[in-house]
Amino acid sequence: MSETHDKPTSAGEAPGHPRFLAHHYGSFQQQFEAGKLGMWIFLVTEILLFSGLFCAYAVYRANHPEIFHVGAKFLNAYLGGTNTCVLLLSSLTMAWGVRCAQIDRRRGLIVCLAITLLCGGVFMGIKYVEYRHKWHDGLLWAGWFKPSEDAAETLRGSDHPAPARDEPSADTAPAPESQPPPQEKSRRLGIFFSIYFTMTGLHALHVLAGMGAITWVLVRAVRRHFHSQYFGPVDYVGLYWHLVDLIWIFLFPLLYLID
């Protein structure tokens, strides 16, 4: 996506510099390319930030895979899947919005941005429901991990899975593997939920930042600031929003679909 022509200067604008064209740029094309380069550099720093979290996730899961299988039982895959669909829809409408800005479809741009903003609100609403449920059950980060009676019952049940029909008898079965003491298991689960809240919480903050940026672009679209030669802010916000969606596409299976 690029801007290939300069908008002619109208009588009410400064000579040689149309509205929204910064004075240190010679054309909308140059301004767009410079802005997009800066946006990509910013997105690389965001990727590096989340890469550190994904590395921490990989190390801890490699060392304690059983804790992730137990912890995943307390996550609602249906809510996570719904949020995934919502963000995928928002990426589609954001891409349509960028296209509408490129071809001077102001009404389409406004509608697409509004739908994208609505999808972001739905995502945060579902995430609030999830967090509220975890808070009620005491399934919080390390140091605050104090499971409620129902959660503790589920945790105890995970220690004694139902035997399969073809299992050997008690006389011939090998000795069971040693299980960590309850306090140690709770501590490990607390670390699991620390990872969960850190990764999903940081992602939620990025969603809120994206919603703020979309609101800013939406207000400017209503004020007729964008046209086929000047749509850079819409494109930049769209890139950011797509990255936020992509990060969630990785978070969802890694946290919710472990089993």
Language-model-derived ranges and their functions:
Residues 1-259:
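...captures the hydrophobic TM-helix bundle architecture rather than a specific catalytic motif
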